[in-house]
Amino acid sequence: MENGKRILIVDDDDEIRELLEFDIAQSGYFVDTASNGKDGLNKVLNNSYDLVILDVMMPKMNGFDVCKNIRQAKLSIPVLMLTAKGTIDDKTVGFDCGADDYLVKPFDVQEVLLRIRVLLRRNQPQAEPSLSNEILSAGNIEIFPDTLECVIVNKKIKLTPTEFEILYCLMQHFNNAVTLATLLDEVWGYDSDEDVRMLRVHVGGLRNKIEPDSKKPQYLHTVTNVGYKLTPFGE
């Protein structure tokens, strides 16, 4: 294959799985498939992939549980949820399980290919060398790129890859407002109304992890009509 990237598609719908397999392979990727969650997870744990595309509603194991098991195995491989379950609650569950991106069926294959390119680019350490080895500190917050963790007031917190990148971007602009457009560009590389909603879901998940009370943020503040700002506790 031209670019050598390996992608696993896990979906119990034969038509969708075969369509994606054809179009993704035509774009130069090596493609493997699984028709249920249990087989998909087994393939992830026993093979090396650069990205996983997961359906949610599948026999033997649903996509949320597959994603959760991938993260519990300490694998940082990008996970793209591609499913008919498109409510905010569904997306929140997916992101909490460790998904990096979420597209709702029916989908445009070109949109899927765009998301694949962005997720693969984000997962390349050489593209962002500062993310691979620099421990960043601001106020009483430290973040550790090698483990995707942050420490706040001596409390170690495990983050998803996307939560980590959002926090990293905010820490680079510590105590200053960061626009939604800047966050979308630095974390995803593109923006749309759908992506703004996705960003807000991720920010909600990040607040649940780092804030003493996520309903009364002390670190990660919303700046009306602008975006978000990370500050020292209570400011």
Q: Where are these predicted regions, by residue range?
A:
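Acidic catalytic/metal-coordinating carboxylates
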Residues: 36-39, 62-65
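DNA-recognition element of transcription regulators
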Residues: 108-121, 158-168, 180, 193-213, ...
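Short hydrophobic/Thr-rich beta-strand motif most characteristic of the beta2 strand and flanking loop
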Residues: 28-35, 43
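The short loop immediately C-terminal to the conserved phospho-acceptor aspartate in CheY-like receiver
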Residues: 13, 56-57, 85
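Basic, amphipathic DNA-recognition helix from helix-turn-helix-like DNA-binding domains
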Residues: 60-62, 68-137
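Short, Lys/Arg-enriched segments at the junction into DNA-binding effector domains
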Residues: 5-6, 118-177, 181
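Charged docking surfaces used in two-component/phosphorelay signaling
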Residues: 15-26
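Active-site beta3 strand of CheY-like receiver
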Residues: 48-53, 58
